[in-house]
Protein backbone atom coordinates (compact mmCIF):
# COMPACT_ATOMS: atom_id res chain seq x y z
CA UNK A 1 0.00 0.00 0.00
CA UNK A 2 1.49 3.34 -1.05
CA UNK A 3 0.84 6.21 1.39
CA UNK A 4 1.23 9.90 0.59
CA UNK A 5 -0.04 13.23 1.89
CA UNK A 6 -2.17 15.35 -0.43
CA UNK A 7 -1.89 19.06 0.43
CA UNK A 8 -5.13 20.66 -0.66
CA UNK A 9 -4.36 24.38 -0.21
CA UNK A 10 -1.56 26.93 -0.72
CA UNK A 11 -0.20 29.02 2.13
CA UNK A 12 -2.49 31.81 0.94
CA UNK A 13 -5.53 29.61 1.47
CA UNK A 14 -6.21 29.12 -2.25
CA UNK A 15 -6.67 25.69 -3.87
CA UNK A 16 -3.38 24.31 -5.06
CA UNK A 17 -2.47 21.80 -7.72
CA UNK A 18 -2.55 18.33 -6.24
CA UNK A 19 0.88 17.06 -5.38
CA UNK A 20 2.20 14.15 -3.36
CA UNK A 21 4.60 14.52 -0.49
CA UNK A 22 6.38 11.23 0.26
CA UNK A 23 5.68 10.11 3.79
CA UNK A 24 9.36 9.86 4.69
CA UNK A 25 9.73 13.66 4.24
CA UNK A 26 7.06 14.63 6.79
CA UNK A 27 7.51 12.17 9.68
CA UNK A 28 10.43 11.22 11.90
CA UNK A 29 12.12 7.85 11.53
CA UNK A 30 9.55 5.06 12.11
CA UNK A 31 11.53 3.39 14.89
CA UNK A 32 8.77 1.10 16.18
CA UNK A 33 7.70 0.06 12.69
CA UNK A 34 11.27 -0.90 11.89
CA UNK A 35 11.52 -2.81 15.15
CA UNK A 36 8.29 -4.74 14.51
CA UNK A 37 9.36 -5.67 10.99
CA UNK A 38 12.79 -6.60 12.32
CA UNK A 39 11.41 -8.86 15.06
CA UNK A 40 9.12 -10.67 12.62
CA UNK A 41 11.98 -11.11 10.16
CA UNK A 42 14.38 -12.27 12.88
CA UNK A 43 11.95 -14.94 14.07
CA UNK A 44 11.52 -16.20 10.51
CA UNK A 45 15.28 -16.31 9.88
CA UNK A 46 15.82 -18.15 13.17
CA UNK A 47 13.20 -20.72 12.16
CA UNK A 48 14.89 -21.31 8.82
CA UNK A 49 18.36 -21.54 10.39
CA UNK A 50 17.01 -24.17 12.79
CA UNK A 51 16.20 -26.37 9.80
CA UNK A 52 12.56 -25.47 9.17
CA UNK A 53 11.45 -25.18 5.55
CA UNK A 54 11.21 -21.53 4.40
CA UNK A 55 8.21 -22.38 2.25
CA UNK A 56 6.26 -25.15 4.00
CA UNK A 57 6.80 -25.44 7.76
CA UNK A 58 4.75 -28.26 9.24
CA UNK A 59 2.24 -28.08 12.09
CA UNK A 60 4.56 -29.52 14.72
CA UNK A 61 7.25 -26.97 13.88
CA UNK A 62 4.81 -24.07 14.04
CA UNK A 63 3.56 -25.22 17.43
CA UNK A 64 7.13 -25.57 18.65
CA UNK A 65 7.76 -21.93 17.74
CA UNK A 66 4.63 -20.54 19.40
CA UNK A 67 1.71 -20.82 16.98
CA UNK A 68 -1.85 -20.29 18.21
CA UNK A 69 -3.84 -23.50 18.78
CA UNK A 70 -6.90 -23.88 20.96
CA UNK A 71 -5.83 -26.99 22.94
CA UNK A 72 -2.65 -25.17 23.98
CA UNK A 73 -3.65 -21.48 24.00
CA UNK A 74 -6.83 -22.15 25.97
CA UNK A 75 -4.94 -24.44 28.31
CA UNK A 76 -1.73 -23.57 30.13
CA UNK A 77 -0.02 -21.73 27.25
CA UNK A 78 -1.97 -18.47 26.72
CA UNK A 79 1.25 -16.71 25.71
CA UNK A 80 0.68 -18.19 22.25
CA UNK A 81 -1.97 -15.52 21.70
CA UNK A 82 0.93 -13.06 21.46
CA UNK A 83 3.81 -15.10 20.04
CA UNK A 84 1.74 -16.31 17.10
CA UNK A 85 1.62 -12.70 15.86
CA UNK A 86 5.37 -12.82 15.18
CA UNK A 87 5.37 -16.22 13.48
CA UNK A 88 4.77 -16.81 9.77
CA UNK A 89 3.97 -19.81 7.59
CA UNK A 90 6.50 -19.48 4.81
CA UNK A 91 8.41 -16.76 3.01
CA UNK A 92 5.48 -15.53 0.90
CA UNK A 93 3.33 -15.13 4.01
CA UNK A 94 5.90 -13.01 5.83
CA UNK A 95 6.84 -11.00 2.74
CA UNK A 96 3.25 -9.90 2.10
CA UNK A 97 2.60 -9.15 5.77
CA UNK A 98 5.80 -7.15 6.25
CA UNK A 99 5.08 -5.13 3.11
CA UNK A 100 1.71 -4.13 4.57
CA UNK A 101 3.16 -3.57 8.05
CA UNK A 102 5.86 -1.31 6.66
CA UNK A 103 3.34 0.99 4.96
CA UNK A 104 0.63 0.95 7.62
CA UNK A 105 3.13 1.09 10.48
CA UNK A 106 4.80 4.24 9.19
CA UNK A 107 1.51 6.09 8.83
CA UNK A 108 0.28 4.84 12.21
CA UNK A 109 3.51 5.94 13.87
CA UNK A 110 3.14 9.39 12.33
CA UNK A 111 -0.50 9.82 13.40
CA UNK A 112 -0.59 8.03 16.77
CA UNK A 113 2.99 8.09 17.95
CA UNK A 114 5.49 5.35 18.61
CA UNK A 115 4.23 3.76 21.81
CA UNK A 116 0.59 4.12 20.86
CA UNK A 117 1.36 2.30 17.61
CA UNK A 118 2.97 -0.54 19.57
CA UNK A 119 -0.01 -0.83 21.92
CA UNK A 120 -2.53 -0.77 19.05
CA UNK A 121 -0.53 -3.42 17.19
CA UNK A 122 -0.36 -5.64 20.28
CA UNK A 123 -4.01 -5.23 21.27
CA UNK A 124 -5.24 -5.93 17.74
CA UNK A 125 -2.96 -8.93 17.38
CA UNK A 126 -4.34 -10.39 20.60
CA UNK A 127 -7.90 -9.67 19.48
CA UNK A 128 -7.21 -11.49 16.22
CA UNK A 129 -5.81 -14.51 18.05
CA UNK A 130 -8.82 -14.66 20.38
CA UNK A 131 -11.26 -14.36 17.47
CA UNK A 132 -9.42 -17.16 15.67
CA UNK A 133 -9.88 -19.45 18.69
CA UNK A 134 -13.59 -18.62 18.82
CA UNK A 135 -14.23 -19.65 15.22
CA UNK A 136 -11.52 -22.26 14.64
CA UNK A 137 -10.14 -23.58 17.95
CA UNK A 138 -8.63 -26.67 16.32
CA UNK A 139 -6.87 -24.79 13.50
CA UNK A 140 -3.24 -23.77 13.96
CA UNK A 141 -2.87 -20.01 13.44
CA UNK A 142 0.15 -17.79 12.88
CA UNK A 143 0.92 -14.43 11.34
CA UNK A 144 0.75 -10.68 11.91
CA UNK A 145 -2.40 -10.25 9.81
CA UNK A 146 -4.71 -9.59 12.76
CA UNK A 147 -2.43 -6.85 14.06
CA UNK A 148 -2.01 -5.39 10.57
CA UNK A 149 -5.76 -5.31 9.98
CA UNK A 150 -6.02 -3.61 13.36
CA UNK A 151 -3.67 -0.85 12.23
CA UNK A 152 -5.76 -0.40 9.09
CA UNK A 153 -8.93 -0.20 11.18
CA UNK A 154 -7.43 2.31 13.62
CA UNK A 155 -6.27 4.51 10.74
CA UNK A 156 -9.67 4.36 9.03
CA UNK A 157 -11.66 5.56 12.04
CA UNK A 158 -9.01 8.05 13.16
CA UNK A 159 -8.79 9.66 9.72
CA UNK A 160 -12.56 9.61 9.24
CA UNK A 161 -13.79 10.52 12.74
CA UNK A 162 -10.80 11.87 14.63
CA UNK A 163 -9.73 15.40 15.52
CA UNK A 164 -6.67 15.64 13.32
CA UNK A 165 -3.74 18.05 13.79
CA UNK A 166 -3.52 18.43 10.00
CA UNK A 167 -5.99 19.05 7.14
CA UNK A 168 -8.24 16.01 6.79
CA UNK A 169 -8.55 16.40 3.03
CA UNK A 170 -4.85 15.72 2.68
CA UNK A 171 -5.48 12.08 3.57
CA UNK A 172 -8.64 11.40 1.57
CA UNK A 173 -6.76 9.34 -0.99
CA UNK A 174 -5.07 7.36 1.76
CA UNK A 175 -8.42 6.74 3.47
CA UNK A 176 -9.83 5.33 0.24
CA UNK A 177 -6.77 3.09 -0.08
CA UNK A 178 -7.25 1.82 3.47
CA UNK A 179 -10.92 1.03 2.88
CA UNK A 180 -10.03 -0.78 -0.34
CA UNK A 181 -7.27 -2.73 1.42
CA UNK A 182 -9.56 -3.86 4.24
CA UNK A 183 -12.53 -4.68 2.03
CA UNK A 184 -10.58 -6.56 -0.62
CA UNK A 185 -8.60 -8.64 1.86
CA UNK A 186 -11.66 -9.52 3.92
CA UNK A 187 -13.44 -10.66 0.77
CA UNK A 188 -10.40 -12.62 -0.40
CA UNK A 189 -10.07 -14.19 3.05
CA UNK A 190 -13.72 -15.23 2.99
CA UNK A 191 -13.45 -17.09 -0.32
CA UNK A 192 -9.82 -18.19 -0.20
CA UNK A 193 -8.49 -21.40 1.32
CA UNK A 194 -6.03 -21.58 4.19
CA UNK A 195 -6.69 -17.99 5.31
CA UNK A 196 -7.68 -17.25 8.90
CA UNK A 197 -10.22 -14.52 8.18
CA UNK A 198 -11.48 -14.62 11.75
CA UNK A 199 -8.15 -13.19 12.92
CA UNK A 200 -8.50 -10.43 10.32
CA UNK A 201 -11.98 -9.57 11.58
CA UNK A 202 -10.96 -9.66 15.24
CA UNK A 203 -7.98 -7.39 14.67
CA UNK A 204 -9.96 -5.03 12.45
CA UNK A 205 -12.80 -4.61 14.96
CA UNK A 206 -10.37 -3.83 17.79
CA UNK A 207 -8.51 -1.39 15.56
CA UNK A 208 -11.69 0.39 14.47
CA UNK A 209 -12.70 0.85 18.10
CA UNK A 210 -9.29 2.07 19.25
CA UNK A 211 -8.89 4.45 16.33
CA UNK A 212 -12.35 5.93 16.84
CA UNK A 213 -11.58 6.77 20.49
CA UNK A 214 -7.89 7.65 20.32
CA UNK A 215 -8.57 9.79 17.26
CA UNK A 216 -10.48 12.21 19.50
CA UNK A 217 -7.32 12.97 21.52
CA UNK A 218 -4.89 13.70 18.70
CA UNK A 219 -5.02 17.49 19.19
CA UNK A 220 -4.79 17.35 23.00
CA UNK A 221 -1.69 18.30 24.93
CA UNK A 222 0.85 15.52 25.39
CA UNK A 223 0.02 15.06 29.08
CA UNK A 224 -3.74 15.04 28.56
CA UNK A 225 -3.49 12.68 25.60
CA UNK A 226 -1.19 10.26 27.44
CA UNK A 227 -3.58 10.00 30.38
CA UNK A 228 -6.60 9.40 28.17
CA UNK A 229 -4.79 6.82 26.08
CA UNK A 230 -3.73 4.92 29.20
CA UNK A 231 -7.38 4.72 30.21
CA UNK A 232 -8.40 3.53 26.72
CA UNK A 233 -5.80 0.78 26.71
CA UNK A 234 -6.82 -0.29 30.21
CA UNK A 235 -10.35 -0.73 28.89
CA UNK A 236 -8.98 -2.60 25.86
CA UNK A 237 -7.03 -4.92 28.17
CA UNK A 238 -10.16 -5.60 30.22
CA UNK A 239 -12.11 -6.31 27.03
CA UNK A 240 -9.41 -8.72 25.83
CA UNK A 241 -9.34 -10.57 29.15
CA UNK A 242 -13.14 -10.82 29.15
CA UNK A 243 -13.18 -12.04 25.55
CA UNK A 244 -10.47 -14.57 26.32
CA UNK A 245 -12.40 -15.84 29.33
CA UNK A 246 -15.55 -16.20 27.23
CA UNK A 247 -13.71 -18.14 24.53
CA UNK A 248 -12.09 -20.37 27.15
CA UNK A 249 -15.49 -21.09 28.67
CA UNK A 250 -17.18 -21.81 25.34
CA UNK A 251 -14.32 -23.51 23.47
CA UNK A 252 -12.15 -24.84 26.28
CA UNK A 253 -13.40 -28.40 25.76
CA UNK A 254 -10.77 -28.77 23.03
CA UNK A 255 -8.12 -28.73 25.76
CA UNK A 256 -9.58 -31.87 27.32
CA UNK A 257 -10.16 -33.41 23.88
CA UNK A 258 -6.47 -33.28 23.01
CA UNK A 259 -5.37 -34.29 26.51
CA UNK A 260 -7.65 -37.30 26.22
CA UNK A 261 -6.34 -38.15 22.77
CA UNK A 262 -2.74 -37.95 23.98
CA UNK A 263 -3.49 -40.09 27.04
CA UNK A 264 -5.10 -42.68 24.79
CA UNK A 265 -2.02 -42.74 22.56
CA UNK A 266 0.11 -43.40 25.64
CA UNK A 267 -2.06 -46.34 26.66
CA UNK A 268 -3.67 -44.52 29.60
CA UNK A 269 -7.39 -45.17 29.06
CA UNK A 270 -8.48 -44.11 32.56
CA UNK A 271 -6.91 -40.66 32.19
CA UNK A 272 -8.32 -40.42 28.66
CA UNK A 273 -11.83 -41.28 29.83
CA UNK A 274 -11.73 -38.57 32.51
CA UNK A 275 -10.72 -35.84 30.03
CA UNK A 276 -13.01 -37.01 27.25
CA UNK A 277 -16.02 -37.22 29.54
CA UNK A 278 -15.43 -33.54 30.36
CA UNK A 279 -15.40 -32.72 26.65
CA UNK A 280 -18.55 -34.71 25.92
CA UNK A 281 -20.36 -33.15 28.88
CA UNK A 282 -19.77 -29.69 27.38
CA UNK A 283 -20.49 -30.73 23.81
CA UNK A 284 -22.61 -33.90 23.48
CA UNK A 285 -22.53 -33.59 19.68
CA UNK A 286 -18.74 -33.73 19.44
CA UNK A 287 -18.26 -36.98 17.53
CA UNK A 288 -14.48 -36.73 17.62
CA UNK A 289 -14.62 -36.82 21.43
CA UNK A 290 -17.22 -39.60 21.45
CA UNK A 291 -15.13 -41.77 19.12
CA UNK A 292 -12.05 -41.30 21.29
CA UNK A 293 -14.09 -42.03 24.41
CA UNK A 294 -15.47 -45.19 22.83
CA UNK A 295 -11.94 -46.20 21.87
CA UNK A 296 -10.77 -45.65 25.45
CA UNK A 297 -13.49 -48.00 26.71
CA UNK A 298 -12.42 -50.52 24.06
CA UNK A 299 -8.87 -50.36 25.41
CA UNK A 300 -10.25 -51.13 28.88
CA UNK A 301 -12.36 -53.95 27.40
CA UNK A 302 -15.44 -52.25 28.81
CA UNK A 303 -17.54 -53.16 25.80
CA UNK A 304 -20.88 -52.17 27.28
CA UNK A 305 -19.75 -48.58 27.79
CA UNK A 306 -17.94 -48.56 24.45
CA UNK A 307 -21.07 -49.59 22.60
CA UNK A 308 -23.23 -47.05 24.44
CA UNK A 309 -20.85 -44.19 23.61
CA UNK A 310 -20.38 -45.20 19.98
CA UNK A 311 -24.13 -45.58 19.50
CA UNK A 312 -24.52 -41.99 20.71
CA UNK A 313 -22.00 -40.90 18.11
CA UNK A 314 -23.81 -42.91 15.44
CA UNK A 315 -27.07 -41.17 16.35
CA UNK A 316 -25.33 -37.81 15.83
CA UNK A 317 -24.05 -38.78 12.38
CA UNK A 318 -24.70 -42.27 10.96
CA UNK A 319 -22.37 -41.60 8.02
CA UNK A 320 -19.34 -40.79 10.19
CA UNK A 321 -16.67 -43.24 8.99
CA UNK A 322 -14.67 -43.05 12.24
CA UNK A 323 -17.77 -43.94 14.24
CA UNK A 324 -18.55 -46.89 11.98
CA UNK A 325 -14.96 -48.12 12.08
CA UNK A 326 -14.89 -48.15 15.88
CA UNK A 327 -18.30 -49.81 16.02
CA UNK A 328 -16.84 -52.50 13.78
CA UNK A 329 -13.93 -52.95 16.18
CA UNK A 330 -16.36 -53.23 19.08
CA UNK A 331 -18.43 -55.87 17.26
CA UNK A 332 -15.28 -57.84 16.48
CA UNK A 333 -14.09 -57.64 20.09
CA UNK A 334 -17.43 -59.07 21.24
CA UNK A 335 -17.36 -61.74 18.48
CA UNK A 336 -20.34 -60.29 16.63
CA UNK A 337 -18.67 -60.87 13.30
CA UNK A 338 -21.64 -60.40 10.96
CA UNK A 339 -22.44 -56.78 11.94
CA UNK A 340 -18.68 -56.15 11.90
CA UNK A 341 -18.46 -57.58 8.37
CA UNK A 342 -21.34 -55.40 7.21
CA UNK A 343 -19.67 -52.28 8.55
CA UNK A 344 -16.23 -52.99 7.09
CA UNK A 345 -17.73 -54.06 3.78
CA UNK A 346 -19.48 -50.69 3.46
CA UNK A 347 -16.34 -48.83 4.51
CA UNK A 348 -14.30 -50.73 1.92
CA UNK A 349 -16.77 -49.69 -0.77
CA UNK A 350 -16.71 -46.03 0.25
CA UNK A 351 -12.94 -45.93 0.80
CA UNK A 352 -11.36 -48.68 -1.30
CA UNK A 353 -7.82 -47.31 -0.85
CA UNK A 354 -7.75 -47.90 2.92
CA UNK A 355 -5.70 -51.04 3.55
CA UNK A 356 -6.67 -51.13 7.23
CA UNK A 357 -10.38 -51.37 6.37
CA UNK A 358 -9.69 -54.30 4.03
CA UNK A 359 -7.65 -56.00 6.75
CA UNK A 360 -10.50 -55.62 9.26
CA UNK A 361 -12.95 -56.93 6.68
CA UNK A 362 -10.71 -59.97 6.29
CA UNK A 363 -10.68 -60.45 10.06
CA UNK A 364 -14.49 -60.30 10.19
CA UNK A 365 -14.81 -62.83 7.38
CA UNK A 366 -12.26 -65.01 9.16
CA UNK A 367 -14.43 -64.92 12.28
CA UNK A 368 -17.39 -66.09 10.20
CA UNK A 369 -15.39 -69.00 8.79
CA UNK A 370 -15.41 -67.55 5.26
CA UNK A 371 -11.68 -68.13 4.82
CA UNK A 372 -11.50 -67.85 1.03
CA UNK A 373 -13.18 -64.43 1.09
CA UNK A 374 -11.03 -63.44 4.06
CA UNK A 375 -7.88 -64.28 2.09
CA UNK A 376 -9.08 -62.08 -0.78
CA UNK A 377 -9.67 -59.17 1.60
CA UNK A 378 -6.20 -59.58 3.13
CA UNK A 379 -4.65 -59.73 -0.34
CA UNK A 380 -6.43 -56.50 -1.25
CA UNK A 381 -5.02 -54.86 1.90
CA UNK A 382 -1.52 -56.02 0.96
CA UNK A 383 -1.86 -54.75 -2.60
CA UNK A 384 -2.48 -51.31 -1.08
CA UNK A 385 0.20 -51.60 1.60
CA UNK A 386 2.77 -54.38 1.17
CA UNK A 387 4.26 -53.53 4.59
CA UNK A 388 1.08 -54.32 6.53
CA UNK A 389 2.40 -57.11 8.73
CA UNK A 390 -0.94 -57.73 10.43
CA UNK A 391 -2.53 -58.35 7.03
CA UNK A 392 0.15 -60.96 6.29
CA UNK A 393 -0.57 -62.59 9.63
CA UNK A 394 -4.31 -62.68 8.90
CA UNK A 395 -3.61 -64.05 5.43
CA UNK A 396 -1.48 -66.81 6.96
CA UNK A 397 -4.32 -67.80 9.27
CA UNK A 398 -6.81 -67.81 6.37
CA UNK A 399 -4.49 -70.02 4.30
CA UNK A 400 -3.90 -72.38 7.22
CA UNK A 401 -7.66 -72.79 7.76
CA UNK A 402 -7.91 -73.85 4.11
CA UNK A 403 -5.08 -76.38 4.47
CA UNK A 404 -2.68 -74.32 2.32
CA UNK A 405 0.43 -74.97 4.43
CA UNK A 406 3.12 -73.62 2.09
CA UNK A 407 1.22 -70.39 1.46
CA UNK A 408 0.43 -70.08 5.16
CA UNK A 409 4.08 -70.51 6.22
CA UNK A 410 5.21 -67.95 3.63
CA UNK A 411 2.66 -65.39 4.85
CA UNK A 412 3.63 -65.94 8.50
CA UNK A 413 7.31 -65.57 7.62
CA UNK A 414 6.60 -62.28 5.89
CA UNK A 415 4.62 -61.08 8.92
CA UNK A 416 7.59 -61.95 11.13
CA UNK A 417 9.95 -59.97 8.88
CA UNK A 418 7.68 -56.95 9.20
CA UNK A 419 7.60 -57.19 12.99
CA UNK A 420 4.12 -58.62 13.47
CA UNK A 421 3.37 -61.57 15.71
CA UNK A 422 4.55 -64.95 14.53
CA UNK A 423 2.11 -67.65 13.55
CA UNK A 424 -0.14 -68.86 16.37
CA UNK A 425 0.50 -72.25 17.99
Describe the role of every protein-language-model region.
Residues 264, 298, 325, 332, ...:
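Position-specific recognition of the canonical hydrophobic site in helix A of tetratricopeptide repeat
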Residues 282, 316, 350, 384, ...:
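Structural marker of alpha-solenoid helical repeat scaffolds
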Residues 253, 287-288, 321-322, 355-356, ...:
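Helix-start (N-cap) detector for alpha-helical repeat units in TPR-like alpha-solenoids
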Residues 2-265:
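A detector for small-residue-rich transmembrane helices and their helix-helix packing motifs
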